[in-house]
Amino acid sequence: VVYTWKDEKSGGTRISDPEKAKQIAEKAKRYPLVLQNVEKKKKQKEAPLLYDLTELQRDASARFGYSAKQTLNLMQSLYETHKVLTYPRTDSRYLTKDIVPTLKERLDAVSIGPYKALAQQAKRSPLNGKLSFVNDAKVSDHHAIIPTEQYVQLSALSNEERRIYDLVVRRFLAVLLPPCVYEETVIRASIEKECFTARGKRMVEKGWQEAYEDNRYDEEDEAKEEVREQNLPLLEAGMKIGQPKISLREGKTKPPAHFTEGTLLSAMENPVRYMENRDSSLVKTIGEAGGLGTVATRADIIEKLFRSFLLEKKGNEIYLTSKARQLLKLVPADLKKPELTASWEMQLNDIAKGKKRRDVFMEEIRSYSVELNDEIKTEEGTF
């Protein structure tokens, strides 16, 4: 069993003082580890929500290295040509109530090959109490991406199309399967007043996770550094473990990772963390507006930046070109901030509510554009 040291005051698992770390390691060599508390809880986890376009683009980028534009094109083909998936340019991850009666037909349509057993299981599973993915209020123009009632011929799809189709079908099946049920064990131990923790998990019922061959959607806890998930033997409070092996792991603070297309899409959808001004009205407005761009335009925006040689890819990571760095030096600071989009959206909302006149807003934009132009002309840099 791997136990991780934990600061009782802060809850952190890192020690910045090397001497203190060595002192704790010395204690572990001289004193036993005593189990203070062993707590077991049965938990359940619902399936992830259905796909909207952005979430699908993120997954396709992470799994297959597909660009946002490539995923959109593949989705468009599956929608228009093969007619096996629903409308792709949606920003909703929910279904409307009128779709519920069609779910059985859609399950019949995907009840082939690798999906047959799962589809049959989903049909046997009662829908009562698990329609959390049905919410009319969270669907504006188009519902989440799901299979149509059209029977699919997998042999008619290209390899790339099959990959996208597979993502959508498995997600669709997952929301119709029972929750995943597991038993979580949390152990709190000590070595001479130093706190150590361990956490383990035992699967009780796989539920919706049967729709996935890997445990991609069971990573929430594993992503936390303060504990490690592991299979645990039978342990009880009061047990002593004599002279446990101890290891010190030295680490360094890493700079922020470069964007991939998937993480860039996430940042465009929710740019709040990149805002210097966290004014609540600005944050609320940009959230309601759906971030920078729309679900239908983000792929084209990213593609245009590549075509204009402002961005370049090295592997899956995105880098600025020298041309982009030149441009960013010339552009006034306000024009590079998400706050500007939020401010304009607020004013457009005021126009829609009759609180502001359209011609006044347009005149302000014209004046602002002239000021920007003059400011850029006086800059010393060139582009």
Locations of regions flagged by a protein language model:
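Conserved phosphate-chemistry cores used by DNA topoisomerases
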Residues: 1-84, 89, 98, 156, ...
